[in-house]
């Protein structure tokens, strides 16, 4: 999997954060409902991921800002901000397929950046999977610039098969 790492220095001083975010709900913790919704948005079916990932989220020691958008009571979009010194890392931006291209990801990103700024963040960073052109366009429009590319290597099992990604 190839990923692109992006960062925006002084993103808050730019004019990219003018999107209102009235649909976004924020939490200072990571609710189990949010994690389950994230699995559903990503179509995560791997039982190992479903078992291990919640404990990984719960083990985050840094201050978090968890965001979601609900329609008819169902979470249709997620985002997570993790604060570290004067940075906020943006993670888990996902929107249910039929709700894409309606500005929900922009609302979540803008909300996380502004809420992070209220808590002392002056810079932001994120990572995006290579080939996710829609996300990359959104992040560029928010002032992010590509810094570098990296990839993960996965060892095949004894039969030469690679584990499923989901």
Regions found by a protein language model. Name each.
Residues 141-166:
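…primarily DNA-binding HTH/wHTH and HhH modules…
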Residues 126-136, 153-158:
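Conserved beta-strand-loop-alpha-helix junction that forms the acyl-donor binding cleft
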Residues 48-96:
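A conserved beta-strand-loop-helix scaffold within acyl/acetyltransferase catalytic domains
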Residues 116-127:
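Conserved GNAT acetyl-CoA-binding A-motif
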Residues 95, 101-114, 118, 137, ...:
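Conserved acetyl-CoA-binding loop-helix of GNAT-fold acetyltransferases
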Residues 1-8, 12:
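Single conserved hydrophobic/aromatic residue that forms the stacking wall/gate
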Residues 10, 14-52, 166:
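Short amphipathic alpha-helix that is part of the acyltransferase structural core
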Residues 6, 106, 130-149:
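Conserved active-site alpha-helix within GNAT-family acetyltransferase domains
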């Amino acid at each position: 999997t190839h990923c692109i790492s992006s960062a925006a220095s002084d993103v808050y001083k730019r004019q990219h954060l003018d999107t209102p975010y009235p649909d976004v709900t924020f939490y200072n913790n990571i609710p189990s409902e949010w994690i389950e919704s994230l699995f559903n948005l990503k179509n995560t079916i791997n039982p190992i991921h479903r078992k291990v990932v919640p404990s990984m989220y719960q083990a985050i020691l840094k201050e978090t800002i968890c965001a979601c958008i609900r329609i008819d009571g169902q979470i249709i979009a997620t985002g997570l901000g993790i604060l570290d010194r004067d940075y906020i890392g943006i993670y888990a931006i996902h929107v249910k397929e039929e709700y894409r291209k309606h500005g929900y990801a922009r609302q979540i990103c803008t909300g996380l950046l502004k809420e992070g700024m209220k808590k002392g963040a002056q810079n932001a960073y994120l990572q995006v999977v290579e080939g996710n052109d829609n996300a990359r366009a959104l992040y560029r429009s928010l002032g992010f610039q590509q810094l570098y590319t990296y990839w993960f290597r996965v060892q095949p099992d004894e039969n030469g098969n690679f584990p499923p990604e989901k």
